[in-house]
Amino acid sequence: VAAAWKSLLVLEDVEHALVMGVAGTLASATAADQADFLIFVPFDMTLKRLKASVKVAPSSSTTFQIRRSTDSGGTFSNAFGTVVISSSAKVGVADPADLNVDEGDLLNFSITVGGGSGENAAIHVLGVQR
């Protein structure tokens, strides 16, 4: 019986969400490293998708760029792609090319052209363990 169940078992990658955010009004111009708290990558992962949400919609399209540090937060560089929340919208979704990250890497994000509007953003980085 156990062998029969094993043959029916389908293994799928389980997605994990790493979430970071910033409280208050979004930046009015390009502003790097905006996360209120840096996010540790908990294990070796392949990042797959991005989602962003805001409590108050921005008056102009706002781009969030994921940034990564491999040196304990000493420096951050753009990584993994961007997600855009369009003018007057509250959510954005993106499917950039996959990126492998390592346990202990730190994630942050930059904001471009927030128009000084929109409030309280959450950035969701979705990935699978590798």
Segments from the language model and where they lie:
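Short beta-strands within extracellular/lumenal beta-sheet-rich domains
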Residues: S28-F43
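Glycine-rich, low-complexity segments
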Residues: V1-T30, K55-A57, S61-T63, R67, ...
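Extracellular carbohydrate recognition
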Residues: G116-A122
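A short beta-strand element within beta-rich, extracytoplasmic domains
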Residues: M45-V56
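Short, surface-exposed tryptophan/glycine-enriched loops
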Residues: K90-E103
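Surface-exposed loop/turn positions
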Residues: M45, E103-D105
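Short beta-strand-plus-loop segments that form exposed binding edges in beta-rich domains
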Residues: F109-G116
